């Protein structure tokens, strides 16, 4: 009972913060994209349009909930709920500061990678249950892409695990703090591992240039083709949460988390996460989409061998007494 109460006391604020941050991230992306395209972006709802995401949610809640006549209704309704839940669940083990963390477990890295893989289940459910060929093809592409890019993601995440000697995210941050992570990057495979993890995160979150599962010119809207209203909104929200949490996890694994000059704390974690979040959308609005063959060749021909070399380099660095 005490464990359940502890989880609720720490989990509910984390969920609230994640959802609020996702809404602000959506507003930020629109303003950021508008700047790139010489537009103004949202301006009408709230100061500088900051309440536009809230208006979008209210609009989606009022829309009619439609399901195809031949769809598997139970799985069709369940898929967006599970997709959103899996995306939020990853935030439970992310240490935003030494004290702001819902669950500081010893296998935090394993938990993050495992829950990230679970998102494939509701994605496939949504595509199959829709009884729509475009949704099914989008789901198949999403599964193939995620399974492929999970390999370099896992291998690149092993680099800080090997260096820190722990799978706890908090321990990895403390290791980086003790060894001055910004000074060690030139001497260990941290920087290339960060680049590989970042690219894999883009692919896992279906962000441009890796968004072939929902390529509008080919698949209308991918797995969300038949979804309307808030069910569509849950899939949409899950993508943004996934992107935000991926930025936070990358900050913890490779950028020192809450550690920083002068006064380490939550503010450094927020700054690093926002910078990565902004860079993801800078890439999105600057590059074109890969073809399927190019995407798979990049993964298996370049990223997987490079990540294997980095794991071996990290092990050799530790063996040579680099810790």
Q: Predicted segment positions?
A:
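Selective transmembrane helix interface/packing segments
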Residues: 1-323
